[in-house]
């Protein structure tokens, strides 16, 4: 079958320990999940604990590569607004850890995807890391702007409105 199974770990909170997340990833792997979105530890993000963020992202990315799973590491870039250096450091961590995707947001925080974040991510990330823009994408024009800015995938609850808004 061409149907893939996707899931989410620690979504949207980002509160689980790495050990708890890995237990979930193992269960999902055993069940044959092909894609898993997960929220990076938000306390580490807020503290700018880059070593903890890198350990988490690398451990999960390595596991996913070994088990043929596409991982999508969710940052919540809005929590880093006003801290360009932190946003760049997250991108450098991703370049070393190599998740399949770096995702802007859960779409459930106080801020969703922002064009300037996607542009920065595309500028900073190596070509083998995909970008998923999620949260606050409501129509075709916004969706196209995020794709033009460098997003490889979109997360939006307005998928039908986006598709129906495409100019004919």
Where are these regions (language model features)?
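Active-site cofactor/substrate anionic-group-binding motifs, chiefly glycine-
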Residues: 1-35
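Alpha-helix-loop-beta-strand connector modules within alpha/beta enzyme cores
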Residues: 1-11, 50-74, 79, 88, ...
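Short histidine/acidic/glycine/proline-rich micro-motifs that form metal-
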Residues: 11-13, 42-44, 77-81, 108-109
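Glycine-rich tight-turn/loop motif centered on a GG-T
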Residues: 11-18, 40-52
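Catalytic cores of alpha/beta
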Residues: 16-30, 80-93, 116, 120-123, ...
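Short acidic/polar alpha-helix capping motifs at helix-coil junctions
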Residues: 23-24, 53-57, 83, 108-109
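Residue-level signature of catalytic and energy-coupling elements of molecular machines
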Residues: 28, 73, 102
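Glycine-rich phosphate-binding active-site loops on the catalytic face of alpha/beta enzymes
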Residues: 31-45, 96-111, 135-168
């Amino acid at each position: 079958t061409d149907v893939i199974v996707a899931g989410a770990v620690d979504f949207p909170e980002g509160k689980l320990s790495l050990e708890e997340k890995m237990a979930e990833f193992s269960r999902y792997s055993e069940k044959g999940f092909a894609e898993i979105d997960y929220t990076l530890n938000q306390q580490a993000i807020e503290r700018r604990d880059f070593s903890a963020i890198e350990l988490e992202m690398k451990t999960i990315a390595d596991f996913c590569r070994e088990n043929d799973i596409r991982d999508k590491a969710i940052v919540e870039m809005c929590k880093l607004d006003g801290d360009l250096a932190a946003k760049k450091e997250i991108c450098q961590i991703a370049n070393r850890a190599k998740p399949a995707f770096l995702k802007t947001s859960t779409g459930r925080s106080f801020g969703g995807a922002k064009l300037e974040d996607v542009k920065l991510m595309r500028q900073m990330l190596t070509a083998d890391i995909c970008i998923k823009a999620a949260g606050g994408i409501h129509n075709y024009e916004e969706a196209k702007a995020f794709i033009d800015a460098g997003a490889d995938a979109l997360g939006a609850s307005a998928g039908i409105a986006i598709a129906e808004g495409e100019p004919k």
